[in-house]
Design a protein with these regions (language model features):
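Short acidic, S/G/P-rich loop/turn micro-motifs used as interaction or catalytic elements
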Residues: 69-74, 104-106, 163-164
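Short, internal strand/loop/helix patches
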Residues: 112-144
């Protein structure tokens, strides 16, 4: 909770920096762009293991949640429980959450220790070489664009965080319902 004021200030800063028209333009430019998820260049952690293949890689639709080096990775780990309702959607194997963390090299060990202590039962991908952003230059640096849905062709179909925006949550659920 001690990071809540910081996150609130960041959200206010972002909301004051971008006009709704600017956001619409950025989202419009992202939609339909093919996004590469270089699974083979990232490490996948699950509980106390390192694994090499997950349902995430095989799912038709992937909700990518990208946490870059500018964000507080351990803060995101502490908030992972909020994704519980969306993890339940993974039972239908056409959908999966894809958490990608790109921590600064100096923080990687502490992130690993923290992750294994949280006993989360969901894989996360750790991008230590920043290959995800390198292979996807169309993804803006602002955190508000770091959660998006990829369709079956790995094209961006929806941009936004369903935890923070009920309209995005409804659009995501409607999209998945249509595809079942």
């Amino acid at each position: 909770m001690r990071f809540f004021p910081f996150l609130t200030i960041c959200a206010l800063f972002v909301s004051c920096t971008f006009s709704p028209q600017d956001c619409k333009e950025v989202i419009r430019s992202m939609r339909g762009k093919t996004t590469v998820i270089p699974f083979d260049k990232m490490v996948c952690w699950l509980n106390d293991s390192i694994i090499h293949d997950t349902i995430t890689q095989r799912a038709k639709y992937k909700l990518v949640v990208y946490v870059d080096s500018a964000a507080c990775s351990t803060c995101y780990l502490n908030e992972m429980y909020q994704w519980h309702d969306f993890v339940a959607l993974e039972e239908d194997s056409c959908f999966s959450l894809c958490f990608i963390f790109a921590p600064p090299l100096a923080n990687r060990h502490s992130l690993q220790n923290h992750f294994f202590r949280t006993e989360l039962n969901h894989p996360i991908y750790v991008d230590t070489s920043y290959c995800f952003l390198n292979e996807n230059p169309h993804i803006p640096s602002s955190i508000i664009y770091h959660t998006f849905l990829l369709d079956g062709s790995n094209k961006i179909a929806l941009v936004g965080n369903p935890l923070h925006n009920k309209k995005i949550e409804k659009l995501l659920r409607d999209h998945l319902d249509r595809e079942r």
